[in-house]
Amino acid sequence: MEVNVLQSDMPKDMQNLIRGFIVQGFKRKVEYEDISKYIKDECDKKFGEEFLCIVVDKNTGFGSCLKCAPGSLFMGEYQNNRVILFRI
């Protein structure tokens, strides 16, 4: 299964790495808290910045409004889940 990028203003190479972290997070972990922590930790290590990651089931009627600095937002879908990642 592939991660669909819904919105991102991050560079393409960064997006591709994040997509890989998302797939690995879902393969290695079960609970949403553990998945989001895995993705966040991998991004923190790789990019040397602090990120916040939110993972939710998209079938639960999730909605969100985020305001971030330019070049800091990634939002994608994997299976029936939505992943939102941004630099803080």
Regions from the PLM with identified roles:
Residues 1-88:
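Charged, amphipathic alpha-helical regulatory modules used
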